[in-house]
Curated annotation (Swiss-Prot):
InterPro entries, per the entry: Flag_FlgI
Protein name: Flagellar P-ring protein
Domain of life, source organism: Bacteria
A Gene Ontology BP annotation from the UniProt entry: bacterial-type flagellum-dependent cell motility
Its biological purpose: Assembles around the rod to form the L-ring and probably protects the motor/basal body from shearing forces during rotation.
Cellular location(s): Periplasm; Bacterial flagellum basal body
PANTHER family with a match to the protein in the record: FLAGELLAR P-RING PERIPLASMIC PROTEIN FLGI, FLAGELLAR P-RING PROTEIN
Oligomer and partners: The basal body constitutes a major portion of the flagellar organelle and consists of four rings (L,P,S, and M) mounted on a central rod.
Record gene name: flgI
Keywords, in A-Z order: Bacterial flagellum, Periplasm, Signal
């Protein structure tokens, strides 16, 4: 049976002209970014799907102490409706105190499900250790689990992870350097010297010579007004300037696990001939037992019977002419009906032979 290869090919650039992109689509302003927040909290109100770990009891006891309730030292709370969770959220740039964030709540321990639970007040901290938001509320859990007395279990999706829309209240803003200094720096999403130069040239065409300069393949620095309100208007104009990105370098990306192959536009092949075929050898071992009659006085003997089968697949050869393009390469690969492992071997051999002009990346 012929194994088909999933071959995804980037043909768009070959069929239509390269389209200019807005600066806001290919670059980001340095320093304008989101920040990750994380916290440790308790979910209560679970219908017996919580956990009884020691750290859960300790966290629960600490919470009671914060409310002024002290349990005797010899009393251990029996709780099955409580779970210890990790809470995390992304804090967008320029968000202000009083605004809200969506939070994700994930079970840390052995809780079976968070469905029906409520997150109690949880402090969300940044990497600097400061508290930036406080999360609390009822969760939305898409998954569920059910378990019978005989141990049978049904689980759909992930019942130990939930979300709370607008579940965190921002208490502190993250300081931003956006309005400081004489420059704004744009960082390209994909570093490329040609694209960086084209961006600087496009900005200079709009603002005047020497207003922008490419620092390297990923960064373009622009003189900007110092006044914050003027800088906002200035950036609103700049981010809509259109730039024609440079062509990507020639690459062939191969995912050996899924069999996906992505071939870039500029991949070329030098003259080469490839033979595709394979030898399959199958060895099967079967044990035969010779059992004598009860009164014969003989011994039981075990013998091995080996069956060896060899098959040679039909070999095919295809020839790449000088300057072979992406289309010919794709058609040739499909013609031989190569499996993913065979295609990878062919591409590696072409690269080693110097016939493949492009970077071969295996992921």
């Amino acid at each position: 049976m012929k194994i088909k290869v999933l071959l995804a090919v980037a043909l768009l650039a070959m069929t239509v002209p390269v389209k200019a992109e807005r600066i806001k689509d290919i670059a980001a302003v340095q320093g304008v970014r989101s920040n990750q927040l994380i916290g440790y909290g308790l979910v209560v109100g679970l219908p017996g799907t919580g956990e009884k770990a020691n750290y859960t009891e300790q966290t629960f006891t600490t919470m009671l102490k914060n409310f002024g309730i002290n349990l005797p030292t010899n009393v251990k709370p029996k709780i099955k409706n409580v779970a210890v969770v990790a809470v995390h959220a992304d804090m967008p740039p320029f968000i202000k105190p009083g605004q809200t964030l969506d939070v994700t709540v994930s079970s840390i321990g052995e809780a079976k499900s968070l469905r029906g639970g409520t997150l109690l007040q949880t402090f969300l901290k940044g990497v600097d250790g400061n508290i930036y938001a406080i999360a609390q509320g009822s969760m939305v859990v898409s998954g569920f689990s059910a378990e019978g007395l005989d141990g049978s279990k049904v689980i759909q999706n992930t019942p130990t992870v939930g979300r709370i829309p607008n579940g965190a209240l921002v208490e502190r803003a993250v300081p931003s350097a956006f309005a400081h200094g004489d420059f704004l720096t744009f960082n390209l999403h994909r570093a490329d010297f040609s694209t960086a130069k084209r961006m600087a040239d496009a900005i200079n065409d709009l603002l005047g010579p020497e207003m922008a300069r490419a620092l390297d393949a990923a960064s373009v620095q622009v003189y900007a007004p110092r006044d914050a309100s003027q800088r906002v208007s200035f950036l609103a104009t700049l981010e809509n300037v259109e730039v024609e990105p440079a062509d990507e370098s020639a690459k062939v990306i191969v995912n050996s696990r899924t069999g996906t192959i992505v071939v870039g536009q500029n991949v070329k092949l030098l003259p080469a001939a490839v033979t595709h075929g394979g030898l399959t050898v199958t060895i099967a071992e079967n044990q035969q037992v010779s059992q004598p009659n009860a009164l014969a006085g003989g011994d039981t003997v075990v013998t091995n019977q080996s069956t060896i089968d060899a098959s040679q697949a039909n070999s095919r050869m295809f020839l790449f002419n000088p300057g072979t393009s992406l289309d010919e390469l794709v058609r040739a690969v499909n013609l031989v009906g190569a499996a993913p492992s065979d295609v990878l071997a062919i591409l590696e051999a072409l690269k080693m032979a110097g016939a493949l002009h492009g970077e071969l990346i295996v992921i």
